[in-house]
Amino acid sequence: MLPTFLIVTQGMQHKGPALLALISLLSSLIVLYLSLPILLPSTMPCKSVSAVCLAAVSMVAAQCNNTMPAAADLGWHAPNMTAINNLTAVVNGTGVLGFIFNTSATPATSSYSTYNWCNMPHVRAQEYVSVSKDYQLKYVEVIHRHHKRTPYASNTFPHETYSWSCDDEALFYYGTPIPDGTAAQINWKVFNSPANPFAPAGFNGTCQFPQITGQGLNDSRQHGKDLYGVYYGLLKFLPTEYDSSKVKYRVTNNVITSQVAGEVVEGMYLSTTNNPTQVLIQPASIDSLEPAYTCSAASAQYSSYGVSSKAANWTAHLNASASLFAKLDSVSGVNASDSGWHNWFDHYFDNLSARLCHSKALPCSSSNSSNCITYTDAEAVFRRGEYEYSFIYRDSPASLAASTGAFGVYMSELAANLRGVMNGSDPVIYRHNIAHDGSISRLLSILQLDVMVWPGMGSEVVFELYEKSQCWYIRVLWGGQVMRSSNPYLGRMDLVPVSNLLAYIDALVGVNGVKVPRLCSAS
């Protein structure tokens, strides 16, 4: 609501011009003062409220109409209703909306923007839409899921009927003392000893479960090439050669993100081939990117309405899938009482999609080779998995609060990075974060994506910060296209005032994440 003195001015057009000008000036100054908590951190290099700082803010406010956003809308806004989150379509439907689950290469008959679980669409030159030349790109932050991998050991069947070989790649693990050390390039080779009487869980063969596969490493390298093709090739924004003072890469404590990083970095900068390249990583107990810091309140919220909950709107799809579970269990050998496999479809989804992405046969029973999971069965699993992620991270009204606690620290880091560029204190122009589906899902949840999906392999969100006439704007790309938020305060995130995004993040988690510890400890 506008202050009374602002409303009064609308009816005083007939009064003396001097009086009207004075009232208008006072109105502007008061609105500016009320906006200072948002303006100071987001637009100016001010460390404290001083006369000089106020003058600088006044100047910017006069130049930009985007520095005084309305109060951020912190409400949860429902995603669009589609076949993804329609329970009837999920249970009784066929196919998976044209989504791809069996190749990294999206067929020429499909648009590149088509959902491809094995290798999701990302920014690349062929589809990239440049903004007007009036806008100058100042900063880019990329966050994406790792690329395709073997399934987690916990998601393999008690007895797999064929082996899985990873002899087409090498995974290196070694250390080097600094500054005067060297090392042999040590890589792991999985083997089975005839003198070891125990059989490995899941697949026999030469893979770790999980590890990024050889195909996944190739996808990772191409991802790096595609990003460089846009941000250097098209826009001449990135440095020609790798410069660690301007370009930063970050991984989580899960080694599969480092496996991806090795190829992404080389795909962007060939000079890094076989050369030491530093990536950033936070301590395992407080890693905000994975995320791995303890947030008991968020965990309690998720379990109150999602996986393991007894909430009717969660269990409805599980109860309607009893016959599907029975078929899957008869092939896999998983016990019907195993809650990990039956309180959601995550385990079956990971197992079956990993096979298909690597051109492996869908499984048959170890005791009856004619009893097999069909592609129709797999599609039924995939529909339910997509439904679950939409429900957990968007459809439930509790999802915004849960995701804010669980991923709020990364959001505060993103805001700090944007401010550092805007106020001139941070020389880094490009940050690249390699994360997980849980990271991307929570980010999309907080930004309130209008159509939620399970983020597939390589799923990518890009934040582009632009300046025009000393005003700052943000463009957010999801899968290479402008993101649409169900929250009208964010809306279509195409060159919106960055002050809107910063105000939204600040209101949720506080500057530098100061609200997150309290959010995570709330009962």
What are these regions (language model features)?
Residues 63-248, 252-431, 435-523:
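Signature for phosphate-centric chemistry
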